[in-house]
Amino acid sequence: MEVRILTEADAEAFWNIRLRALRDDPESFGSTFEEFLERGIAGVAQGLRKRTGESDDATFGAFDRTIVGITGFMREQETKRHHKADIWGMYVPREARGRGIGKALLQAAIAYAKTLPGLEKINLSVVLTSKEARQLFISLGFEPYGLEKHALKLQNKYFDQELMSLDLTR
């Protein structure tokens, strides 16, 4: 398995796996399938091009012949928040879970974060129904620091998200 930062050339692969994530696990993401579909592959390619051009943001992909997992990394840009970054959009399809793909993606994002001067912490949120993802985050040192009740609403059903953080200064 190879984990690397995605480029514009990976737009179609990212597009397909992200659409699958939003279709198969809609409660785990803030975006909807329809919202992402509207962006189109051209919008995805532009986003990946922008991310690879900005040294602090990256989208990671795990490949085992084809793409088998994704996660995003975005550093806060405001001066008072520039010491923080966020993990977003992490997804590994059900049939690929349990093979260490999510762990490899997160380890790549954490290693990347440690190369960025002044970055002190990485935050993420995880929907409480994603027990395996939560356990993975804890195993890599993320610590819970809060709970956002009713963080997401899908078809009149609410989903709570646990807020977690990894201290890079330790």
Residue ranges of model-derived segments:
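Extreme N-terminal starter segment of soluble prokaryotic enzymes
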Residues: 1-3
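Acetyl-CoA-dependent GNAT
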Residues: 8-9, 15-16, 20-89, 93-95, ...
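Short hydrophobic/aromatic beta-strand or adjacent loop that forms the aromatic wall/cage
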Residues: 57, 159-163
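Glycine-rich acetyl-CoA-binding "A-motif" of GNAT/NAT acetyltransferases
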Residues: 66-69, 132, 158
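Conserved glycine-rich acetyl-CoA-binding loop
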Residues: 80, 89-107, 116, 128-135, ...
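Conserved GNAT acetyl-CoA-binding A-motif
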Residues: 113-125
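Conserved catalytic-core motifs of GNAT/GCN5-like acyltransferases
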Residues: 123-126, 138, 143-159
